[in-house]
Every structure is written in structure tokens, then in C-alpha cells.
A protein has these predicted regions:
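N-terminal strand-loop element at the rim of the active site
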Residues: 2-40
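Conserved acidic donor-binding segment of nucleotide-sugar-dependent glycosyltransferases
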Residues: 281-294, 302-309
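Short His-centered aromatic/hydrophobic patch
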Residues: 62-69
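A conserved mid-protein helix/loop that constitutes part of the nucleotide-sugar donor-binding site
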Residues: 169-192, 204-210, 295, 329, ...
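Nucleotide-activated donor-binding/catalytic signature segment of Leloir-type glycosyltransferases, i.e.
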Residues: 207-230
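Acidic donor-binding loop of glycosyltransferase active sites
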Residues: 58, 237-252, 265
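A short, active-site helix/loop in glycosyltransferases that binds the activated sugar's phosphate group
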Residues: 109-151
Length: 345
């Protein structure tokens, strides 16, 4: 409806079929031969494939961090109007980050616009503050299409019933179990929480968290494992609140907070200077607590469990905030306007 035709270029270890039709546009895939530090690297055919697509496009839209895209950006075909969405600083790979710095500086400097996903990240990212001019730097929040209304879940298939949570309040943690998610703090907070905590997802920290629960002798932490899309929405619709206790800036935004807001659920997140505190407003849509502070985290969870009226009011305001700032349509209109602004008329 906005009159923009899109093509997406990406890498995959198994890039067959090479082209996929999606609602957003055609997805074109080349082979990823290696992924050091979670950075997929392509071969000569990737450069050829990108060259063809870049020559077709009027505007190139890059995403950061992906160092292979910096290599694509030096190709002659990339000398076009271009923008970059800056998702996150490089947090963990500091040594590699120093080696990558000159190429990163060149890439950021070559962009007509660099988009931070929240005002907080634009203000607190040292890279954005040092390497991106005020004229280049824009803010467009990430958005998400509304997943509601959803079909009712049959009782026989209910994950809430299967986990034994039908008649009790619970706090939901949803997503991949990664080191920066602060889930060890959430488990520690469970010692002081008057309700059940559900960890829905799988990932590298699974065994560490299970061992921590066993070591502490906790009976109010439930591991749901990886859940389906329908199960995810059932858990979101039935939980008291969503907790995202990420303690490192690798959690640059927190899309799961938007999913909770869609379901009119309050949120609990940590003050880490990123987009999480832009989505979740302290004392309005939920609570923002200090990172790595299990007592404060437990206090916030207990307050929402004990006060259903406050929890529902915060959840209602979270839904309103989603509708005002974070829908997919709002994001699309913002990027369409940006593309127009960098394109010669």
C-alpha cells in the first residue's frame, strides 16, 4: 500500500531454495560458508548476487551489526542512496570489534541515514555518538503487526493446563535462553517471589539455569521449553506479567515486550540504557528495576501478583502505548518517508 517493492538479501548455511516469496518481498539467499562470532560470511557468489540486487534497487537498506554487509558496501553497486538500521553495539566480541573498527567507521560514514531503534540507544551508544553525525542519526522504533485477535486454544491442547498453571498467577519469561538475558537473576529472585515463574524457550543457558534451580531447591520455576506460536500467545494471554531481566546492552530493544503489550500485559525490565526502557515505561506500563538486583525484581513481581487491579491497569496502558508507537504500520510509514528523503527527486 505504500508503493515500495522490496527484495531481501541474506546468507544461509542451506540456501535452497535460493529465493523465497514472502509478504514483505522476495528473499534472496546465498550460502554462508562460515560464521565466526555469529557473523555469517559468504563466498564469491554472494557478492555477485548482491551486485545484481543492488543495481536493481533505488535505495539500499543495511542492518548493523553484520560485518559481511560492510564488505558488500564497498562494492561499486552500493554507491546508491542507503540507510542502515543500527540494532546493537558490539558488546561481547571486544577484540574482534577493535579489528573491525576501521571498516565499521567507513560504513557508518557512508550512510545517508543511520537509524537507532530507540531514543535511549541513540543517546547512549558510544559508536553512534562518536561516528554518526547529528544529521545522519534518526530514530525509528521497531514495530510489530498485531497478532490479535487469536483463535481460542482448545483445553486439551492448553500449555497452561499441561504445566499445571490453570488456577494460579505466573510471571512469564519468553525467548532464547542467552547469557545476556539475566535469567540467572530471575531464578535467584524466585527465592523471594510469591508466585510461579515460567521460562519459555530453549538456548545455551538451559542447563546452567536448571542446575541453579536444583541447587537453590526451588519449586516455583517451571521450564516450558521451546513453545509453538500458538503456545506462546496462550502463555502471554494467561500470564500476570512478562519479565525481561536482561542485564547487558546486548538486549538492545526487547521485541518480546511488544508482544506482551499486544496482549495488554504489564512488563518488568531492567534499566540498561537501551530500548527496553523506551518500550516499558516505569510505573506506567510496568516496572523498570536495576539490573542484577534479584530483590528489586522479586518486589516488582510480587506487587503485580498481589494487585490484579494495578496489573490490569498497567497492561491496558501498555496496549495503548503499543497502538500509538509500535505497530508495524507506523514503522513502515516512517521508513517509507526516510527512503523518500534520501532519494533524489
Amino acid at each position: 500500500p505504500l508503493g515500495i517493492e522490496s527484495a531481501v538479501f541474506t546468507l544461509s548455511p542451506s540456501p535452497l531454495p535460493a529465493s523465497l516469496s514472502r509478504a514483505e518481498g522476495m528473499v534472496h539467499r546465498s550460502r554462508s560458508y562460515w560464521a565466526p562470532a555469529s557473523c555469517d560470511l559468504g563466498g564469491p557468489e554472494a557478492f555477485r548476487h548482491f551486485d545484481q540486487l543492488a543495481r536493481w534497487a533505488d535505495v539500499l537498506h543495511f542492518h548493523f551489526p553484520w560485518p559481511f554487509a560492510d564488505l558488500l558496501n564497498v562494492m561499486p553497486a552500493a554507491r546508491k542512496p542507503k540507510v542502515m538500521t543500527y540494532h546493537s553495539d558490539i558488546v561481547k566480541q571486544r577484540v574482534l570489534g577493535r579489528l573491525y573498527y576501521p571498516l565499521m567507521r567507513h560504513t557508518l560514514g557512508s550512510m545517508d541515514a543511520v537509524v537507532a531503534t530507540s531514543p535511549a540507544y541513540a543517546q547512549t551508544s558510544p559508536v553512534l555518538q562518536q561516528l554518526v553525525s547529528a544529521e545522519q542519526l534518526k530514530v525509528i522504533p521497531l514495530g510489530m503487526n498485531d497478532a490479535l485477535p487469536l483463535a481460542a486454544v482448545d483445553g486439551a491442547e492448553s500449555i497452561v493446563a499441561r504445566l499445571g498453571l490453570t488456577d494460579q498467577p505466573f510471571i512469564l519469561s519468553l525467548g532464547v535462553l542467552r547469557y545476556y538475558k539475566g535469567l540467572h537473576v530471575l531464578v535467584e529472585a524466585a527465592r523471594h517471589t510469591r508466585g510461579t515463574i515460567v521460562l519459555a524457550g530453549s538456548g545455551p543457558e538451559d542447563q546452567n539455569l536448571r542446575q541453579q534451580v536444583a541447587r537453590l531447591g526451588l519449586d516455583n520455576v517451571v521450564f516450558a521449553g521451546q513453545v509453538s506460536e500458538a503456545e506462546k500467545h496462550e502463555l502471554l494471554s494467561r500470564c500476570t506479567a512478562l519479565a525481561l531481566p536482561s542485564h547487558l546492552r546486548s538486549e538492545a530493544y526487547g521485541m518480546v515486550l511488544l508482544e506482551a503489550a499486544m496482549h495488554s500485559k504489564p512488563q518488568i525490565s531492567c534499566d540498561i540504557g537501551t530500548g527496553t526502557s523506551f518500550i516499558n515505561q516505569h510505573l506506567d506500563t510496568g516496572f523498570v528495576v536495576p539490573p542484577e538486583d534479584p530483590e528489586s525484581l522479586a518486589a516488582a513481581m510480587n506487587r503485580l501478583i498481589a494487585d490484579d487491579v494495578e496489573a490490569q491497569a498497567m497492561g491496558h496502558r501498555a496496549r495503548q502505548r503499543y497502538e500509538q508507537h509500535f505497530t508495524g504500520a507506523i514503522m513502515a510509514r516512517s521508513y517509507a518517508a526516510l527512503y523518500q528523503s534520501v532519494t533524489p527527486h
